[in-house]
Curated annotation (Swiss-Prot):
Encoding gene per record: PARP8
Keyword NAD: yes
Top enzyme class: transferase
Record keywords, A-Z: ADP-ribosylation, Glycosyltransferase, NAD, Nucleotidyltransferase, Transferase
Family the entry assigns: Belongs to the ARTD/PARP family.
Region (Disordered): 113-138, 291-310, 750-777
Chain positions with ADP-ribosylcysteine modification: 332, 367, 376, 395
UniProt name for this protein: Protein mono-ADP-ribosyltransferase PARP8
PANTHER family, A to Z: POLY ADP-RIBOSE POLYMERASE FAMILY, MEMBER PARP
Keyword Metal-binding belongs to the record: no
GO cellular-component term (any): nuclear envelope
Amino acid sequence: MGMCSRQERIQKDIDVVIQKSRAEKDCLFADFRYSDSTFTFTYVGGPRSVSYSVHVSEDYPDNTYVSSSENDEDVLVTTEPIPVIFHRIATELRKTNDINCCLSIKSKLQKENGEESRQNSTVEEDSEGDNDSEEFYYGGQVNYDGELHKHPQLEADLSAVREIYGPHAVSLREYGAIDDVDIDLHIDVSFLDEEIAVAWEVIRTEPIIVRLHCSLTQYLNGPVPTVDVFQISTKERFGLGHQLKKIMQTFVTQQWKQSKEKSNCLHNKKLSEKKVKSPLHLFSTLRRSPSYPPPGCGKSKSKLKSEQDGISKTHKLLRRTCSSTVKTDDVCVTKSHRTFGRSLSSDPRAEQAMTAIKSHKLLNRPCPAAVKSEECLTLKSHRLLTRSCSGDPRCEHNTNLKPHKLLSRSYSSNLRMEELYGLKNHKLLSKSYSSAPKSSKTELFKEPNAEGRRLSLTSGLIGILTPSSSSSSQLAPNGAKCIPVRDRGFLVQTIEFAEQRIPVLNEYCVVCDEPHVFQNGPMLRPTVCERELCVFAFQTLGVMNEAADEIATGAQVVDLLVSMCRSALESPRKVVIFEPYPSVVDPNDPQMLAFNPRKKNYDRVMKALDSITSIREMTQAPYLEIKKQMDKQDPLAHPLLQWVISSNRSHIVKLPVNRQLKFMHTPHQFLLLSSPPAKESNFRAAKKLFGSTFAFHGSHIENWHSILRNGLVVASNTRLQLHGAMYGSGIYLSPMSSISFGYSGMNKKQKVSAKDEPASSSKSSNTSQSQKKGQQSQFLQSRNLKCIALCEVITSSDLHKHGEIWVVPNTDHVCTRFFFVYEDGQVGDANINTQEGGIHKEILRVIGNQTATG
């Protein structure tokens, strides 16, 4: 053990003793000091004070010397850590009031060391107090029989996890000295497609670990555990972990409160009584000290306390938007489930609503709801900030309730089946093309049986995840938040809940966990909603990825995002199409928004955008220097750049040359995915039934700022509509590139000139383009940009073909795949037909197995 780690270990052990001694009301010791490798403390509970000294060596805890001021010649040599030594002294003093008790400990330890080796030693105790000292400390230094005091319910829950998910689905790290255990639940995420996993910054071949820090001997009867979420290989930058950690902490906190009932196990009862009698019982009832975390999980005291409460300082402010946690009383439970929560059988309305459910742990199970359109509550701005019905399914429909009253009222014990479901958008979420979600009726589902939960994650995703169309997209969030029945123990329930939430994380705000509101369903990349408190938390608490990281890994994509933002701002239709408007915290006043969707100032946004250094220059100089230059020119330039990057909800990757479509004749080719796992899996299921093909979608470059953040929408008969809707409402596609080029703003003269009339100016332009090599050619050189997307479309009866113009009314049947950008009037071949065999084959080659088309 190195010197640095040795000192840290000693200091941690001393902190454990000091912290918990001070927390005990009748502590017998005071004057704790540590200097020159000696830890001293004074006994003040007797007729006279006695000082004890613990001298540590370089190979601590080996060769540790213990003595007292009453008998400093007789020294104890031990291999025990400081907390164990202290606990045994305190126990002996309480029992015997003998200030020389150190000697009795010495004799016992010497006898023990003479009989057995250190690794296999078990201290032969004559009293319950000394048995407690073994239980007090266990970190690998003592071969403590952990099975002896491990809570029986914990053993049962661990066995259930291993039986259902396999022996590698859970692992333990026990810390018996402080009555703590780390339970690592391994959540399989291999069901994610590779490109989706990359978009979420998740390693799909490696499980996500949900770590619970809880009491080893008390388990469900102990303090609420803290939660960590991480992947071993991505601990440093695991953005998805921030969101999932908040979700799982809230879930665990709520379920812990529901389950805090004493076990009937006699062993647990005796153990609890013994802990109360222990002189330093606080040592075994508190969780591990914040100064003694497992490797890689260090936390300050303040952070640990915040997590124990299940809510951060900023998140407390978000409580006014209504907690997203679903109480046990609010969840889908079977009539027979009475052990871990109140049975719903007392409410006849609940019994009547019980129906069957599809058997799979990844089903987006809707919470019980019987929604009537006339019961939908219209929320005004600043009332409830678009509170989802998943926050509390039993909310009564009282329009006179003010937010604080609504959030603090005690709910009736009877399950109320009428649901608040239809919500009008809050001002902060209002978008020009957005409409209130339609109210719909959902069924009350039962929990799938255990056999159903054995199915693989991949099979569960195909065809059964709730569609994310405008009329039914609201069902998925409620199903994902529905609490699984605890029929196989708390740990299995926790895994099931994590498996429910992970595929639909993109549908919820990363801060408040309320569902996003979009007209045509959720997008791919998780991000923050537009509620002001969430924006503040997202931009100031380190949840948002740094622009420097994004530029380092995808500079060409950032360059494209900035160009799209500029095109939307310069458009005469910016009032309609520049959505979402930026929400940016003022760097000089973190309590204010410099760019506020409720107070739009397009000129100020353009000024900040003009001050952003070109992305190409950012890649050629130290990023911090570039940032300083931008801050001097305009303090809002860099925050705006951060927003442009973080608000993008689509996954865009610059295609390498070997994966580009040669017939598109542009170096600016991108993989563009905007469909979340649920939509991709539904798309895949539909493809198996009906097949699919490819078609182009043309739209002006100015529209793509919004499309990347809100998806392809049916603009027909809305103010977003730019062209006529001759063939009805839907997304317009074409297998012919020439038609889609027209929709993108390229006129026919440009296309003919580029292909059939090589004028001198065109020749010089082509020559100039061909001479650009290396990094220069990777970035956009012009602000005169045109673009076209290549989409995959389901060939079902819903696809209406009118010659070379196709109309798809169902947005779930269209998934973007590629995006092509052209500069200065340059275009690709205007006569490309995706239905030609060679073209279709080339598209499939480039896509490969990276998306749901595989």
